[in-house]
């Protein structure tokens, strides 16, 4: 019985000598922030990797209206820019107007003599970029002809009229002499002259208006010459007319001379438009114009320019994000996300960053969880958190700076004759968009890779910093945790966090506890052996005592044992 008691006491001593079962050790784990539901982003090495935070880089919707602040937006209402320039009677309100962006509506219509412009897109672009319809009348002398031709197709009020910026010349009496007129440009700016030629619907109309069976118009400068012959013939009726007017334009540089020669069918200029160089433009849109502020306008409406990319519309005006084909591109602004597990670590209550992240951290991206004689706790590490944030902050602004530029991208128009040019332009434009789309995806993937790498690096830096502080006073348990072999209260844990921990103070205690643990059982598993040996010896002694009792009882006659063969 004495032996049994000794073995039981030995077993109790084994447990009592375990430093971790009392107040002599502590556990410290390092970890990082995690969220229950992260955001998937793309990196160079992964198509989908989860991060705690990400920012959308693609603006995919407009505000549904065009803002009239930041730019002078002129609503064309029922008028196109060209009709306003020519002086269509119902567009007289736009004479001498200025704009940054002229908005053409789908409801716009012409309400004068039917016309066509062979190079419509170029003229529209030139007038739009000038940003004004400032017009100066000049004293052209037209001798021997009748000026100010009118048409019932072009009403100004109830009276027959014509384009206010053009002078329709017809016969005077029974003659239409050859006209030769010159107009020098003695100014220091370019002048834009608008002129035209009338195509009668029949030979009878031709001779009735111009006497000659076929007229001719030649307009020249030192740099160019255009000769146009009317195409006589019936066309579809428009506003009661089967004839047409073709509109042409000529730019006269400073020091150059405009020369006009004609023997019939001339629609003459009344003066010039002063050309200005600028970033004004024209856009087709049915979005309403409202009082708001935006630096980027699309036909769909204004859009914010706080993102580097947009896929609202290829046509833009102002300081706008680049158009790309992707609907979404997310920039990682947080670390790799590893959602917290329900069962955490070999110590139950805490586990390190290698096993999983920690949800609910509000005071930092990186931090400590600990278990000591005072209980358990958690605290963030502001220094490593700030180091990571400083590197991530500004990423979005840098991407915007690389992609945003003040420019305008107008829609391209080509006549049917220029179909091949149109196809080529569309191919070039599509290629540019494809290239930007690829570059955008690559740029974001590189930035995301850098973000994840640097946040991982900050976690490793914090771990190495802690390991160097603890030295031989603690053991790396793996998984981002340390077992501290001395009593470490909350003040001690705080010194580890703020970098003031002095391992020399605790060195002797830590070494002593470490040797006890190593020598007895914790590290080598001797506890299990001692327990099994103690159990086996106890069972053996119980059997011996029981057998001895039986033999003693037999000798005294208290127990009789009969053996039968």
Curated annotation (Swiss-Prot):
Residues 551-565 are cytoplasmic. Disulfide bonds join 29-481, 67-292, 79-91, 112-154, 296-320, 488-492. Keywords: Clathrin- and caveolin-independent endocytosis of virus by host, Clathrin-mediated endocytosis of virus by host, Disulfide bond, Fusion of virus membrane with host endosomal membrane, Fusion of virus membrane with host membrane, Glycoprotein, Hemagglutinin, Host cell membrane, Host membrane, Host-virus interaction, Lipoprotein, Membrane, Palmitate, Signal, Transmembrane, Transmembrane helix, Viral attachment to host cell, Viral envelope protein, Viral penetration into host cytoplasm, Virion, Virus endocytosis by host, Virus entry into host cell. SUPFAM superfamilies: Influenza hemagglutinin (stalk), Viral protein domain. The keyword Transmembrane applies. Residues 1-16 form the signal peptide. The record marks 344-345 as: Cleavage. One of its GO terms (cellular component) is host cell plasma membrane. GO terms for biological process: clathrin-dependent endocytosis of virus by host cell; fusion of virus membrane with host endosome membrane; fusion of virus membrane with host plasma membrane; viral budding from plasma membrane; virion attachment to host cell. Coiled coil: none annotated. A lipid is attached at residues 554, 561, 564 (S-palmitoyl cysteine). Palmitoylated. Glycans are attached at residues 23, 37, 53, 68, 78, 180, 300, 498. Residues 17-529 are extracellular. One of its GO terms (molecular function) is host cell surface receptor binding. It holds the Pfam family Hemagglutinin. It is found in: Virion membrane; Host apical cell membrane. Major glycoprotein, comprises over 80% of the envelope proteins present in virus particle. Homotrimer of disulfide-linked HA1-HA2. Binds to sialic acid-containing receptors on the cell surface, bringing about the attachment of the virus particle to the cell. This attachment induces virion internalization of about two third of the virus particles through clathrin-dependent endocytosis and about one third through a clathrin- and caveolin-independent pathway. Plays a major role in the determination of host range restriction and virulence. Class I viral fusion protein. Binds to sialic acid-containing receptors on the cell surface, bringing about the attachment of the virus particle to the cell. This attachment induces virion internalization either through clathrin-dependent endocytosis or through clathrin- and caveolin-independent pathway. Plays a major role in the determination of host range restriction and virulence. Class I viral fusion protein. Responsible for penetration of the virus into the cell cytoplasm by mediating the fusion of the membrane of the endocytosed virus particle with the endosomal membrane. This is Hemagglutinin. The lineage of its organism: Viruses, Riboviria, Orthornavirae, Negarnaviricota, Polyploviricotina.
């Amino acid at each position: 019985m004495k032996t049994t008691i000794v073995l039981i006491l030995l077993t109790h001593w084994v447990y009592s000598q375990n430093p971790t079962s009392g107040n002599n050790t502590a556990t410290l784990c390092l970890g990082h922030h995690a969220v229950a539901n992260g955001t998937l982003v793309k990196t160079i090495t992964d198509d989908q990797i989860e991060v705690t935070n990400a920012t959308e880089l693609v603006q995919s919707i407009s505000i549904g209206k065009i803002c009239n602040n930041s730019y002078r937006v002129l609503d064309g209402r029922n008028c196109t820019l060209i009709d306003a320039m020519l002086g269509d009677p119902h567009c007289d309100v736009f004479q001498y107007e200025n704009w940054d962006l002229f908005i053409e509506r789908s409801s716009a219509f012409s309400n004068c003599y039917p016309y066509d412009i062979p190079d419509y897109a170029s003229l529209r672009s030139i007038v739009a970029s000038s940003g004004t319809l400032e017009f100066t009348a000049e004293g052209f002398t037209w001798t021997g002809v009748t000026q100010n031709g009118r048409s019932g197709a072009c009403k100004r009020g109830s009276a027959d009229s014509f384009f206010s910026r053009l002078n329709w010349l017809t016969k005077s009496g029974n003659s239409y002499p050859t006209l030769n007129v010159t107009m020098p440009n003695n100014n220091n700016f370019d002048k834009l002259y608008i002129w035209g030629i009338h195509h009668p619907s029949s030979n009878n109309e031709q001779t009735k208006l111009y006497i000659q069976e076929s007229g001719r118009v030649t307009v020249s400068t030192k740099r160019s010459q255009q000769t146009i012959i009317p195409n006589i013939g019936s066309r579809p009726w428009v506003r009661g007319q089967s004839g047409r007017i073709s509109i042409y334009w000529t730019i006269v540089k400073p020091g150059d001379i405009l020369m006009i020669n004609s023997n019939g069918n001339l629609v003459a200029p009344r003066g010039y438009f002063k050309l200005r160089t600028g970033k004004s433009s024209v856009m087709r849109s049915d979005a309403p114009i409202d009082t708001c502020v935006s630096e980027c306008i699309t036909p769909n409406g204004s859009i914010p320019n706080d993102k580097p990319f947009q896929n609202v519309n290829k046509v833009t005006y102002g300081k706008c994000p680049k158009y790309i084909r992707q609907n979404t591109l997310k920039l990682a602004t947080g670390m790799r996300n590893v959602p917290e597990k329900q069962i955490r670590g070999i110590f139950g209550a805490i586990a390190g960053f290698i096993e999983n992240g920690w949800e609910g951290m509000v005071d930092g991206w990186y931090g400590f969880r600990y278990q000591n004689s005072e209980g358990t706790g958690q605290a963030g590490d502001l220094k490593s958190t700030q180091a990571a944030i400083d590197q991530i902050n500004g990423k979005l602004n840098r991407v915007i700076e690389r992609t945003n530029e003040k420019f305008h991208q107008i829609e391209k128009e080509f006549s049917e004759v220029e179909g091949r040019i149109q196809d080529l332009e569309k191919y070039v434009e599509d290629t540019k968009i494809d290239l930007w789309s690829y570059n955008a995806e690559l740029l974001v993937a590189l930035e995301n890779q850098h973000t994840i790498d640097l946040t991982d690096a900050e976690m490793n830096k914090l771990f190495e910093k802690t390991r160097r502080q603890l030295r031989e006073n603690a053991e790396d348990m793996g998984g981002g945790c340390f077992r501290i072999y001395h009593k470490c209260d909350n003040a001690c844990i705080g010194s580890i966090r703020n970098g003031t921990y002095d391992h020399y103070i605790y060195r002797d205690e830590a070494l002593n506890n470490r040797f006890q643990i190593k020598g007895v059982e914790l590290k080598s598993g001797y506890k299990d052996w001692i327990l099994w040996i103690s159990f086996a010896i106890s069972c053996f002694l119980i059997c011996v005592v029981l057998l001895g009792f039986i033999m003693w009882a037999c000798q005294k006659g208290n127990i009789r044992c009969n053996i039968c063969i």
